[in-house]
Regions:
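Formylglycine-dependent sulfatase
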Residues: 1-429, 437-470
Length: 470
């Protein structure tokens, strides 16, 4: 009997994409038919989250299966040397017989040079440029003409169409929908370099459309009544340095939201070419496809924007679409708590890796969820909570001392601000997500919630301890 071929893997990562910025996820006007097809023919996970909702740390968590506390990429400071030493799942896949490729944004360090674990490398320095970008192709770095999303789409499809005897693993990380920006080695960012830029053919797409705001899109004066940790940050947002950043990308406006949607049109076109390549080469049903964002984003919720770093649902929740017919029936909708830590162990598991290949990983393989669904069983044994953490950095001039550790369960969220207090009293937050899904009513001081707070603090302490060391 012929030995069954190992599955191929495609992970498509979008920069700054919110959980609701796809057609299938409820966007009121964005059309993403090719992306939506992943969830329509597979599974849509409606409770998928980022343990550290920030570009560099979360990307490192995706490829290592580890919390930022363990892998060490804790912010957007340029840790180029460290990023070469990460226990990247692609290196494990190479040992298991895979041909691997990274196409797109790396951003664990500002260098665009190839990292270990990849047979094919197409990337760019730092955030890159939307138009006529410098690309590093297998170590050859030079400027290329064109729109960056189109260029990356072409490189990804070229890799998929190559003849090979091995299974492949493609990590496809778009620059979209991040605006043009320059990030210094210390993590400070300049957003005055051109802002959001759709492809010229999509420049007027969705003109005049309106994105309805969520009930928690409140002015800062209202927010601080319930969330005192934000008092200093909101005061700093009105200074000249802060306004320069905010005004440069039209933060929180309908135009910002429209431009992001228009940028996604090129991403969706590329996904259409991916489908075509897989179908024409006969690889579609043997390929595990995952589509997600690298962190959330705020459109004015809790007075925030253009932040992504924070533990409210808009910041930590991700679209998470999976197509793999051997595991998920078309139209599956799953509400299990999954995180980006689960990607590396899932792919290594599917590739035939042993327990030793995953022993350094803190995420979980999705296999039990897939098998449980096929057998009609409940989610027994799956996680009931996860840690969310952020290490304050200096990217935005108003975000001073905003580090936190948080726990999110199926019912509650508890946020411990590690550097914030008001008159000597902690500024922590507690939300009952069942009765308050928009996190508008901080219950931390309620006498009736003392037991809940004590229990969550104990669970959080255990998660923090587990996150740090082996």
């Amino acid at each position: 009997m012929a030995r069954k071929r190992k599955p191929n893997f495609i992970v498509v990562l979008i920069d700054d994409l919110r959980f609701d910025e796809l057609g299938i996820c409820g966007h009121p006007y964005m059309k993403t038919p090719h992306i939506d097809r992943i969830g329509q023919e597979g599974a849509m996970f409606t409770a998928a989250f980022h343990p550290t909702p920030l570009c560099s740390p979360n990307r490192a968590s995706i490829i290592t299966g580890q919390y930022a506390s363990r892998h060490g990429i804790i912010d957007n400071v340029a840790r180029d040397a460290h990023s070469h030493r990460l226990p990247n799942y692609h290196a494990i896949l190479q040992r298991l017989g895979y041909e691997t490729a990274h196409v797109g944004k790396w951003h664990m360090g500002n260098s665009g040079m190839p990292r270990p674990g990849y047979d094919r490398w197409v990337s760019f320095p730092g955030h890159g440029s939307i138009v006529d970008p410098v690309l590093n192709i297998d170590g050859d770095e030079r400027q290329h003409k064109g729109y960056i999303t189109d260029l990356l789409n072409a490189h990804a499809v070229d890799f998929l169409r190559r003849e090979r005897s091995k299974p492949f693993a493609l990590f496809f990380a778009h620059k979209a929908v991040h605006p043009d920006a320059f990030q210094a080695a210390d993590g400070t960012i300049d957003l005055s370099k051109g802002g959001y830029r759709p492809a010229p053919r999509h420049a007027d797409l969705y003109k005049g459309e309106h994105f309805p705001r969520r009930p928690n899109a409140l002015p800062s004066a209202e927010v601080v009544k319930d969330k005192p940790a934000w008092k200093e940050a909101f005061q700093l947002r009105v200074n000249e340095a802060s306004r320069k950043v905010l005004d440069g990308i039209q933060a929180g406006t309908d135009e910002e939201i429209r431009l992001r949607a228009a940028m996604m049109a090129s991403v969706d076109e590329g996904m259409g070419e991916v489908w075509k390549a897989l179908e024409e080469t006969g690889q579609l049903d043997d390929t595990f496809i995952l589509f997600l964002g690298d962190n959330g984003y705020f459109f004015g919720e809790h007075g925030l924007g253009p932040e992504r770093r924070f533990a409210y649902e808009e910041g930590i929740k991700s679209p998470f679409l999976v197509r793999y017919p051997a595991w998920f029936k078309p139209g599956t909708v799953a509400d299990d708590l999954v995180t980006t830590l689960d990607i590396a162990p899932t792919l290594v598991d599917l590739a035939g890796g042993k327990a030793a290949d995953r022993e350094h990983m803190q995420g979980l393989s999705l296999r039990p969820l897939a098998q449980g669904r096929s057998k009609g069983s409940k989610r027994g044994g799956w996680r009931s909570s996860f840690l969310c953490e952020y290490f304050s950095e200096n990217a935005m001039p108003w975000l001073i001392g905003m580090s936190y550790k948080a726990i999110r369960t199926r019912r509650h969220k508890y946020i411990h601000w590690t550097q914030k207090s008001l008159d000597g009293v902690a500024c922590d937050e507690l939300y009952d997500l069942k009765s308050d899904p928009y996190e508008m009513h901080n219950l931390i001081g309620k006498r009736t919630e003392r037991g809940t707070v004590a229990r969550l603090r104990k669970q959080l302490a255990r998660l923090v301890a587990q996150s740090v060391g082996l």
